[in-house]
Amino acid sequence: QGTWTASVADKLYGKFYTFQIQHNGKWLDETPGVWAKAVGTNGRRAAIIDFATTNPNGWENDKGPKIGSIADVIIYEMHHRDFSIDSVSGITNKGKFLALTEEGTKSSLGEKTGIDHLKELGINHVHILPSYDYASVDESKLETNQYNWGYDPVNYNVPDGSYSTDPYNPAVRIKEFKQM
């Protein structure tokens, strides 16, 4: 019956929280809430972070690309993991948001890879498959080969930790997503 809010004067950075709702006399599972913007591993708990610390250098001056004519737009659809995971991609941050920030990468055959390859093709816009926090990849077991396109959302407002270099730190996934 509406939206409930609460405010706390203290800076509780580094703390986590969940909500638990009782519906028709039954307690439902704990949830980080639909408006969570930062979460812990696997999105089970909302995190309180200082979002200013997630801004990469120059973030406040970042501008979107200018589009002259829609006819000049060349779009490439991609998945974070697929784009960079190959063992000969020459990309350091394979399967991560940061893979899309690496320049000068080459395959073992000397061919351009990553962003440089897209530029070489004339691509000027990228459509990235779901980046939000989703259920099917266990962020605490990234050494295990897991894969999903991300169409099983958990937290729509939070980048998925499996694409970050540290899924245990809620701020890292946000900062690396912004860097991308």
Please describe what each predicted stretch is:
Residues 19, 78, 118, 128, ...:
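Conserved, mostly hydrophobic/aromatic
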Residues 89-105, 138-180:
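Aromatic- and acidic-residue-enriched carbohydrate-binding clefts of CAZyme catalytic domains
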Residues 100-118:
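Short, acidic/polar
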Residues 109-113, 126-127, 172-179:
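Generic recognition of stable, solvent-exposed alpha-helical segments in well-folded globular domains
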